[in-house]
Amino acid sequence: MFKLLDETYKNLSTYTPISDEQIQHYKEKYFGLIDKDYIICIVDSEYNLVAFAITMPSYSRALQKSKGKLLPFGWVHFMNASRKNDRANFYLIGIHPDYQRRGVTAIIFKEIWKTFKKKGVKFLETNPELEENKNIQLLWQDYNPVNHKRRRTYSLDV
């Protein structure tokens, strides 16, 4: 999945390939927490990963209710948010360049829709997106998005 991530985002000016240490860190820190229903993976006929998407239930309300603390009883709010939540966060999508603009995104969204319908999710929030990443902007154009978070990179030659 991480190699596909590198391949997908390598043309963005601010992207830096993920190191093996970072890969190990992310696996240890996050993979145990993610509900497998919220991860969509698509493989080709030879079982090579060609696309993936990662979403998760939103924990914003759980954080608010627990005032940002897990102990002594904040964990209850997180468990409830994991089980019953009408909001989700869209964290990451990666599609191999050879499969972009070939309908793979439609397959991913169909599978995400099935998961959201089963779990009762009605609202989706995305992470901030780079203004220069036109592919991600085009991805949301049919959904009447409200863009209230974006990332911009400034550089200066010294």
Over which residues does each language-model region extend?
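Conserved catalytic-core motifs of GNAT/GCN5-like acyltransferases
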Residues: N127, N144-V158
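Conserved beta-strand-loop-alpha-helix junction that forms the acyl-donor binding cleft
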Residues: I95-Q100, T126-I136
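Conserved acetyl-CoA-binding loop-helix of GNAT-fold acetyltransferases
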Residues: F73, R87-I95, Q100-F116, D142
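Acyl-donor (CoA/ACP) binding surface of acyl/acetyltransferases
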Residues: K118, K134, V158
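Short proline/glycine-enriched turn/loop segments at secondary-structure junctions
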Residues: M79-A81, Q141-V146
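A conserved beta-strand-loop-helix scaffold within acyl/acetyltransferase catalytic domains
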Residues: M1-G94
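Conserved GNAT acetyl-CoA-binding A-motif
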Residues: R87-A88, F116-L130
